[in-house]
Amino acid sequence: MPSPQQRSGSFRKVFVKLPSGKSTIHYERRKDNIARCGMCKKPLNGVKNNYTYKYSKTEKRPERVYGGYLCHKCLESLIKMTIRGIS
C-alpha cells in the first residue's frame, strides 16, 4: 500500500516499466500551472512556475510594481488610467 504522502492528490502516478519487464508505480509531483495576468489572462514572462520553493523571493517574480500579477501591457494601461483619473 502507498505511504500516506503518496495518497494525496499532489502526487501523480507514473507507470514505469523496469528492465526486468515488470511495471511499477512511481509517484511524482504534479506540475504547477503557468502564472497568468490578472487582467488579460496571458501567460506571464519572468515568473517561474515549477518548484518555486527552490528559488529565492527575487527569482520567483519580476521586481516591479504588480510584478507577478500583471503583464507589462496591462500595467502600462493601468498606470495611464490612474494618472488620467479614469477609474
Swiss-Prot record:
Gene Ontology biological process terms, A to Z: translation
Claim: Ribosomal protein is one of the keywords in the record: yes
One of the record's GO molecular function terms: structural constituent of ribosome
InterPro entries linked to this entry: Ribosomal_eL34, Ribosomal_eL34_C_sf, Ribosomal_eL34_CS, Ribosomal_L34e_arc-type
GO cellular component assignments: ribonucleoprotein complex; ribosome
Disulfide bonds: none
NCBIfam families registered for this protein in UniProt: PRK04059.1
HAMAP family: Ribosomal_eL34
Protein name per UniProt: Large ribosomal subunit protein eL34
Organism listed in the record: Sulfolobus acidocaldarius (strain ATCC 33909 / DSM 639 / JCM 8929 / NBRC 15157 / NCIMB 11770)
Classification lineage: Archaea, Thermoproteota, Thermoprotei, Sulfolobales, Sulfolobaceae
GN (gene name): rpl34e
